[in-house]
Design a protein with these regions (language model features):
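RNA pseudouridine synthases
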Residues: 1-299
Length: 299
């Protein structure tokens, strides 16, 4: 990965923009203003302040000519974002790892309308950890254990644990109780999620998603389910629960999408990343981190 020439600022890294192969624009500024007309005034201000740089970190000026396929870097101005009114407690911190108990509704990474108030940016800023990076991700609507690396040089070793399926993950979910289901069960299917499409879907083909599902308790109407994902596809647990007729309570994506206001925190998705366990790639120690949050059956 190419290292950006600008440092982390206020928890946010710079944005990279690649110039087109060929262009009718004479200067970089002309191209930027045409591509982002709503930001034309701020782009000119950033250029005047030397806040737009090339790949070597050299500030660009208004007359800097376009170089085909060259990369430039600048800091985005974060949009006005909804404040997620829930804390993100630290479960563990050492020289390599930061583990937190993410609340529902908080995005893991800067994305879409959640930039400065994503978990990554907030924690970088509040804990003064500019090299902080997530080892894995949780959906914005999912709560529970979320792990970050503190230092750049250890990032790959921990990320490879997840890529190699060397991490044991346990989730809890609340859904309708269905006595006709034969549980426990291992669910396998092929899932795809196209870029720009909100929902994932199951399609014919070789399975790429696997979840072991068991019922922990029920009250006759709702059940508490324990899920053991053996793969990590986007929305895997939500889609697998829906596929057997018991969508997770509070899921506004499956079986059908319905919109929820950004500031409506009344019905959180009843899905919790309860624990993760793995052998540390540096110390060899078996490590386990567990959420202090708990789901409950509706009264």
């Amino acid at each position: 990965m190419v290292r950006a020439p600008l440092p982390i600022r206020d928890g946010l890294g710079p944005t990279r923009i690649r110039m087109p192969d060929a262009s009718q624009f004479r200067t970089i500024l002309d191209y930027l203003v045409d591509r982002f007309p709503q930001d034309s005034t701020r782009l000119r201000e950033k250029m005047d302040l030397g806040e737009i740089v090339d790949a070597s970190g050299t500030p660009l000026v208004a007359e800097s000519p376009i170089v085909p396929r060259a990369d430039i870097y600048l800091y985005r101005d974060p949009p006005i974002e909804p404040v997620v009114p829930f804390a993100t407690p630290v479960l563990h911190r050492d020289e390599n790892l930061l583990v937190v108990d993410k609340p529902h509704f908080l995005a893991t990474m800067p994305r879409g309308k959640y930039i400065a108030r994503s978990a990554l940016v907030v924690l970088r800023r509040e804990l003064d950890l500019p090299e902080l990076s997530p080892v894995h991700r949780l959906d914005r609507l999912t709560a529970g254990v979320l792990m970050f690396t503190v230092r750049r040089e250890v990032r790959r070793a921990y990320q490879e644990l997840f890529a190699d399926r060397a991490v044991t993950k346990v989730y809890d979910a609340v859904a309708r109780y269905e006595p006709s289901l034969s549980l426990p069960v291992t669910l396998r299917s092929r899932m795809i999620k196209e870029r720009g499409v909100l929902r994932a879907e199951e399609v014919p083909g070789e399975p790429n998603a696997e979840t072991f599902l068991e019922l922990s308790e029920h009250d006759g109407r709702h059940g508490m389910y324990t899920l053991h994902p053996r793969t990590g596809r986007t929305h895997q647990l939500r889609l697998h629960m829906n596929s057997i007729g018991i969508p997770i309570l509070g899921d506004n994506f499956y079986p059908e999408f319905y919109d929820v206001a950004d500031d409506d925190y009344s019905t959180p998705l009843q899905l919790l990343a309860r624990s993760i366990e793995f052998r540390d790639p540096f110390s060899g120690e078996q490590r386990r981190f567990e959420s202090n949050r708990r789901l409950r059956l509706p009264i």
